[in-house]
Amino acid sequence: MTRAVFLDRDGVLNKAYVRNGKPYSPDTISEMIVVPDAAEALARLHQHGFRLIVATNQPDIARGRLTRTEVDAMNDYLASKLPLDAIEVCPHDDMDHCGCRKPKPGLLLQAARREGIDLAQSFMVGDRYRDIEAGHSAGCRTVLIGDGYGETFKAQPDATLNTLTEAADWILNQPVTKDQSCPV
């Protein structure tokens, strides 16, 4: 049984830029500021056997603000700083109606199929309603970091915490559920 922690990127692993109350991705590697407790919190999860997989919407690719190469370079930078096993990227915008853009669970399902992950034994950590809904739709337990920017949530998180360290503590204290495997 492979367990995973799926992580949103912007606002969870690196600083999100909030403008008019909404979070935005950094535009350059120089703006990629890794949150202070990320490396230690993720190392603890990794030591306990969790696969660490980033699941990130990057609509600036579809909008023409960033190229896939620029986004990949930022992801490579993040991966050089943190113990990540994979980074799943949705390059689409809402109007593309794809299956991978959170709140749809496509990024999580794709990684679960490829990595043999038991979604019922896994977690999604995010800072927005999209992350929580994607996690619930995939069959994962969910953790909201922060206040969700005042957004309305259709699905409530299993835990609402302030930091990635608190999220790691909570995840590591959750029991392994029995007979609830979610085959992919």
Pin down the residues of each PLM region.
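Non-catalytic pre-domain segments flanking phosphatase-related domains
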Residues: M1-R9, Y17, D85, D169-V184
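Acidic, Mg2+-coordinating phosphoryl-transfer loop and its flanking beta/alpha structural elements
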Residues: V125-N162
